[in-house]
Amino acid sequence: MPKSPATQRLKPRKLPVQARSAHTVEAVLEAAARILETQGLAACTTNAIAERAGVSVGSLYQYFPNRDALTVALIERETAQLLADVERAGQGETSHGRILDMVRASVAHQMRRPVLARLIDFEEKRLPLGDRDQRVADTIHAQLTGALQLPDAPRLADRELAAYDLLAIVHGMVDAAGERGELDAAALERRVMLAVGGYLNGASSA
């Protein structure tokens, strides 16, 4: 199916193939992240990003046709880190351990750079990223389902449905904490695990 014009304009013009060009793209993305953190969305223009990255605007436009395409690339960079952390969490030996590690990965993603995470959440809602959002949800859901299939997991009538519910609980609580500007990762982890534990206890006894 052909890409819609709205989706097509979010694609990079080209991908870096050499170390030098990869360094340029990373410098541009990190410059955008720093501006978002320190000055906010309004200040994050392509001119400001290029200046902060130490490259020409022309060099920036070689890779990104507009600011939205650059923002999507930044979102993808942060998402790749989250998914790598979640996949590592899915290697634990116990159901509880895997779920706890996945909660920690989600909280750490939000708290590592909280201002950036909050603004990226805002941009994710604004931009048409349906395919990306589904890909992320599917990956995390698969990891949660795997955790619920281990021998020590609670007895559940529908593990896949329970994994969707857990995904909603974790995502909702972590995003809400980010919107409130919470910074205490340990406290948030405890609250999320209480909610997850309460759900699993209730579902297994239903």
What are these regions (language model features)?
Residues 1-23, 152-154, 204-206:
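N-terminal intrinsically disordered/low-complexity leader segments
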Residues 21-32, 49, 74-85:
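Generic hydrophobic, amphipathic alpha-helix propensity
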Residues 27, 31, 35-69:
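Helix-turn-helix
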Residues 28-36, 78, 82, 106, ...:
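Short hydrophobic clusters on alpha-helical segments that form packing/core surfaces
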Residues 71-78, 120, 136:
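Alpha-helical DNA-contacting segments of helix-turn-helix folds
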Residues 80-83, 97-104, 108-112, 127-153, ...:
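Amphipathic alpha-helical packing segments from all-alpha helical-bundle domains
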Residues 87-89, 120-127:
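Short linear capping/connector segments at secondary-structure termini
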Residues 146-150, 167-185, 197-206:
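Amphipathic C-terminal alpha-helical segment
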